[in-house]
Amino acid sequence: MRPLLERLARSTLVCLVVVLSASSIAEEDEQKSTRLYVLDCGYMDMAGWQGFQTFYGFPESAVAIPAQANPCFLVVNQGQSLLWDAGLSDATPSTPVMTEYGVRFSLKSKLAKQLQDLNYPPEKIDYLALSHLHFDHIGNLPYFVNVKTLIQRDEWNAAKDAGPNDIGYNRRSYSPLEDFTKLILLDGDLDVFGDGKVTVFRTPGHTPGHQSLIVHLDQHGPIVISGDVIHFTEELGALNEASDDAAPGEPASALAKLFSRVEEIGGELWVQHDPVQDKARKYAPEYYE
């Protein structure tokens, strides 16, 4: 009986070693794979809002989009992580509420909870990259006070110099950055992890220091995330009409730079706020790789 028990014990130990080895290999493979998660960071009901005509000079014929998605994105690469934008505040109610901007905001899922569920809680994020400092992209800044945070220097200066009537810049939203311990001000493009997988690149126009994101995925291929260079695909005609004589750094040239990068890398353009594209995206815990 004892030899049988010893053989069973040895067999169990071998199986356990095999399982643990397979688990280690799986974890190693997961770390080597670049993954992109889409996170729910709010929704904006913009029915009747004339902000694109009032603030950006679009013609009255500009198409009216009744709603915009407001996703954030988590990139995991070689065991490191980058969060793109911080969305509406987790304090935003789930029922749409009218704000002083004339837009109804709502939030179904809190960003902190989504990150926690993916085992990347806010305090463990390696990088936070912000497309720009308008309030709908930075609502959860207080979670990331000790995270390396990437913004363009021009954007930081524009926010600090903004007057009370400047659309989008809200001191209550961006002031937490003043307490950040690892704020990194960029003066151009950055290969974030040094391996060409994730790049932030300047696209000034919507704001003076706006930036967009490129993520190279092995299976899906390259994805270019627009930020607010463009809000929805139907905007293209109106944007071109409004910006025929735009100077460098204004919307038309930013859009041209965005399209140039998409074409250069053979990428797929994700219009961040576009509600139609958003419905086709798979959200976390599913991912792209």
Q: Model-found features: residue ranges?
A:
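Active-site metal-binding loops of divalent metal-dependent hydrolases
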Residues: 41-42, 86-88, 133, 154, ...
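Cap/insert and terminal regions of metallo-dependent hydrolase folds
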Residues: 90, 101-113, 214, 219-289
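Active-site metal-binding motif and surrounding structural segment of the metallo-beta-lactamase
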Residues: 96-151
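Bacterial N-terminal signal peptides that target proteins for export
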Residues: 1-12
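Short, electropositive alpha-helical surface patch
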Residues: 135-141, 205, 209, 279-289
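Metallo-beta-lactamase
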Residues: 20-124, 152-202, 220-227, 250-266, ...
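Bacterial N-terminal signal peptides
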Residues: 11-20
